[in-house]
Amino acid sequence: MRVLFTGAECAPFFKTGGLGDVLGSLPNQLAKEGVDVGVVLPLYQDLPEKYRKNLKYQGNFIVPVGWRNQYCGIFTLKLNGVNYFFIDNEYYFKRPGIYGYYDDGERYAYFQQAVIMMMERFDFIPDVLHCNDYHTAFIPFLLHEKWGFVDAYKGIKTILTIHNLEFQGKYNAKTLPDFFGMNYDWFDSGIVRMDNDVNWMKTGILYADRVTTVSPSYAREIQTVEFGQGLDAILRMCSHKLTGILNGIDFEKYNPKTDPVIKKNYDVYHLHHKSKDKIALQKELDLPIKPNIPLIGMVSRLTAQKGCQLLLDELDNILQFNVQIVILGNGDPYYEHRLMEIAERYPDKLKVILAFDVKLAQRIYAGADSFLMPSAFEPCGLSQLIALRYGTLPIVHEIGGLADTVWVYDETTNEGTGFGFKEFSGYQMVQAIKKMLALYQQKNNWLKIQKIAMKSDFSWKNSADKYKWMYGELIG
């Protein structure tokens, strides 16, 4: 079985969010299980030198982008059993960062066509071509309608994974001829059109053999008006081929027993050592050293989607409890400013670090008692999975992947892995925090829940097994 992944980002080369984590982990796990795996990526300027120096040049060809003939060089790298192909074009990709350029539409139109043309030229014809998010969502359509005449491509099955439906790739109708050399008939017929734009995501949903998203709950939610981002009717129409498969986390990387950046390593059988990480975190952030005070951590982009307004509305009230809170992240300047203002008023209770700091994040996962994740919507979420792995009990809005991965504590059975609130309101969030604080005082019960949380299996093996089954079903 040969599977070719493609997307706009992939750890460890370049990553801005969950898409990069998935493309950095799922192919690796599949390779461990004997699948012949490739990943095609743009060769961005920011590729770290330790990888760039090992790239092997394989050749080049021309990609027509409308009336323009654009160079495409192919470089390869084999890492952890995965074949990586890098699409080289300095005009499109020799720039800082990944996204946010005025010509992103043209850049990823070029990239998608380069991916398709590369497969035959460099003899990597997959059984399954696995596309990710809008940057590659037009590929199933192009493969079928523009390159359908290529015999080598006729057996390829396509999967489109939606990591975040908010971003859809909406472009003017003139981009059909200008980027793809295709006529307006496809637009006029409505096949690629949505709200008078070409919509790559909508088209990919229609043309892909299977559509997946990153949790079962999110797969259901995006078929509703509330969460469907205008594509709910299309997704309901395609519900027969829509599946939610949870993301995983790297159990080797996120392991409190071996994590090199935390103060004291621990596991489910030596949870008493976790308190040393808490004290170390309090020292590092200049909080009063109080091992018995509940410490809530939050590692997040500071945006409305992540529930920051909800948090701001209730933060003064929460800080009246006997609690310490540590928030790490950056994002919307308004939320950054407001959080810093509140932190100045509560120097012994609240620390806000406006940064993206992977090592400090690890120390927060290890040192906190509980982890707050009040997202307005969350396709899957990785932070709550890491928190569970570290025995740091999540407090979550029961939505999307958060609902699928956090087993909300039941006081009658004394079982669960965290705390939740169904209604997206400040009052309900505070009630969930109060339940956490009450359980924290019951040390034996708290320890029991921590152990259940740490034994939860959200490794990539579970996800990879589900995808392998889907690939097998597709190719027969």
Curated annotation (Swiss-Prot):
Disulfide bonds: none annotated. It is an enzyme of class 2 (transferase). Keywords: Glycogen biosynthesis, Glycosyltransferase, Transferase. GO terms for biological process: glycogen biosynthetic process. GO terms for molecular function: alpha-1,4-glucan glucosyltransferase (ADP-glucose donor) activity; alpha-1,4-glucan glucosyltransferase (UDP-glucose donor) activity. ADP-alpha-D-glucose binds at K15. Its EC number is 2.4.1.21. It catalyses: [(1->4)-alpha-D-glucosyl](n) + ADP-alpha-D-glucose = [(1->4)-alpha-D-glucosyl](n+1) + ADP + H(+). Pathway: Glycan biosynthesis; glycogen biosynthesis. Belongs to the glycosyltransferase 1 family. Bacterial/plant glycogen synthase subfamily. NCBIfam families: glgA, PRK00654.1-1. Synthesizes alpha-1,4-glucan chains using ADP-glucose. This is Glycogen synthase. The lineage of its organism: Bacteria, Bacillati, Bacillota, Bacilli, Lactobacillales. The gene is glgA.
